[in-house]
A protein has these predicted regions:
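Cytosolic regulatory regions built on CNB/CRP/Popeye-like sensor folds
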Residues: 1-159
Length: 159
């Protein structure tokens, strides 16, 4: 499907165009067509400020891309992180089923793209193996950055 056809159908919304121009880190080094196909795979879900997206210890088989807005991650009453546009929640969802989550809440009105595990796996099965290897490498880099950030925060707390 080309851009003109998508735009003429009214499917290509501003947040999707923005994500195509500057893809999230999880899709880094994907070709334009692969980024577009992956974005189209996601189910758009709208949330409002204060909404709970996922509850504590909920089991999920999906990941969420923040297309617009900002969310916070909570464990009990402690805010663990704030995530912005272009960040993923649960990016390791392809590697295990029924992942448990922390509470995810909207800090402002949001549009999330929800990716079901089964559909995402089928997406990669239909493409060259190299694309899944790039995706896996991106996940590892994201996880390394999260660990480094947590280490820095822990170190700051211990001072």
């Amino acid at each position: 499907m080309d851009d003109e056809k998508i735009i003429s159908q009214g499917i290509m919304q501003k947040h999707l165009r923005d994500l195509l121009k500057d893809p999230p880190n999880l899709l880094k080094n994907f070709h334009y067509e692969d980024v577009l196909a992956f974005l189209e795979l996601g189910e758009q879900i709208h949330f409002f400020k204060g909404d709970t997206i996922l509850s504590d210890d909920e089991y999920v088989n999906a990941a969420y891309l923040i297309a617009e807005g900002k969310v916070s991650v909570w464990k009990e009453n402690i805010q663990l992180a704030t995530l912005d546009k272009k960040e993923f929640l649960g990016e390791t969802f392809l590697f295990s089923r029924n992942n448990r989550t922390e509470r995810i809440a909207c800090e402002e009105d949001c549009i999330l793209l929800k990716y079901e595990r089964y559909e995402a796996l089928n997406y990669f099965r239909k493409r060259p193996e190299k694309l899944f290897n790039i995706f896996t490498k991106n996940i590892i880099e994201i996880q390394q950055n999260k660990i480094s950030s947590m280490n820095s925060q822990l170190f700051a707390l211990m001072k």
